[in-house]
Regions:
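C-terminal helical subdomain
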Residues: 128, 150-188
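Ankyrin-repeat alpha-helix packing hotspot
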Residues: 50-51
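Conserved helix-to-beta-strand junction in the class I
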Residues: 63
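Catalytic loop of short-chain dehydrogenase/reductase
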Residues: 30-37, 43, 69-121, 130-143
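Conserved Rossmann-fold cofactor-binding substructure of NAD(P)-dependent oxidoreductases
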Residues: 2-20
Length: 188
């Protein structure tokens, strides 16, 4: 499924239409360096990390069994987004790589909190996981200082398997409406 293509998201939902789901972990995400628009006219980072992730889960919610769980990947960067910034404020002139990524994570976290309230009556748990800074291609900023960051910073970041731990904890926990990190559980 291509989360930057709404038709692809709809096709994935259709392919899963006869499937009962015990859990869904939403772990796809991007951080675009430049401002680009999807074929639907949405900024690409917001489209993948928020809009189509939300559309996918809204469409699949009826297929999640009682006692099932939905998990959304968030980021600590979300706390640095000012309250007055929203998806409508992102355009060619206001776009920033990290700023837009952080906004997408703030939005998906807010969506997850609201969904946790709505899904509670059906016995469906909804949580977020924050993997921390994981050694992956996502942290490459495609800037002149990447080689320096690789030398001084990469040795201190988490291996990918440790980044998966919060998602597993969030999926298996009896709690709902929480953010799971490697060591802690936070209320939204």
């Amino acid at each position: 499924m291509d989360l930057n293509d709404t038709a692809s998201v709809k096709a994935a939902v259709e392919a899963l239409s006869d499937t009962t789901l015990a859990g869904v972990v939403n772990n796809a995400g991007i951080m675009c360096r430049h401002y680009t628009l999807s074929s639907d006219g949405y900024e690409t980072t917001l489209n993948v990390n928020y809009y189509n992730t939300m559309r996918f889960n809204n469409a699949l919610l009826q297929q999640v069994t009682q006692g099932g769980a939905l998990v959304f990947t968030t980021s600590i960067t979300r706390i640095f987004v000012p309250r007055h910034i929203n998806a409508d404020s992102v355009n060619r002139h206001t776009f920033g790589q990290l700023k837009t990524y952080a906004l997408s994570k703030k939005l998906i976290t807010g969506y997850a909190l609201e969904l946790a309230r709505k899904a509670e009556s059906r016995g469906i748990r909804v949580n977020c996981c924050d993997p921390g800074i994981v050694n992956s291609g996502m942290i490459t900023m495609h800037r002149w200082y990447d080689s320096l960051a690789d030398i001084f910073f990469r040795p201190f970041i988490r291996a990918a398997y440790k980044g998966a731990v919060p998602a597993i904890r969030a999926l298996l926990s009896p709690l709902s409406g929480r953010i799971f990190t490697l060591r802690n559980i936070h209320k939204h």
